[in-house]
Amino acid sequence: CALMILFAGSVVFIDNATATLVLGLLGALSGVALAFVTGHGYLISSKPTWNTKKLPLAYTGTAAVAGGFLYVAIAAFAGADPAIVRALCWILLGCVAFSAVFSVAWLRHLGADRVRQNLDLCRWGIVVCGLVIPVAAAVALAIMPINAFFGVVAGFGLVAALAGGIALRVLMWVVGAGFLFFFEEAQANRSAILNV
């Protein structure tokens, strides 16, 4: 967060493209690393739906897309150098492609039955909000002129990417935490389970 605030401050208050670029790259790289580490923390061999390297890569992809849209939106609204904004758009396209590959790979890891059981979440949350809208918005940003509407498209892409990332995480918990009701059952029937 601190690097993001410094980046935004450098765009608005400091007229130094190098400082802005360095702060932006540091913030982006630390965000990507933290997203991967968070996703990797869920690799648990007793939960087959979580025990795959595709999960932290999908986490990383969705976080990178949301972060990419945020950087593009801030740069556009702050009136950053158009060359930097264009470079961010191309980086964003790479993030969107990465996210699409690993989100779909993780959905395939879950299998068709689990996806069908959670069809609305997968269809509207992950596919539409997390993949289709970000892809369309990123392509539009890469080819459209930088104007007031540019920032609106970046903001719309950001909101959709956040919704898609949240949907992926919700699905992770829905398919991976099915055993949690056993704790409630044990609490309700404590004497029968513990023979007391």
Where are these regions (language model features)?
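Extramembrane terminal tails and long inter-domain/linker segments of multi-pass membrane proteins
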Residues: M172-V196
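Long, contiguous internal "core" modules enriched in hydrophobic/ aromatic residues
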Residues: L3-P145, F150-G151, G157, A161-A167
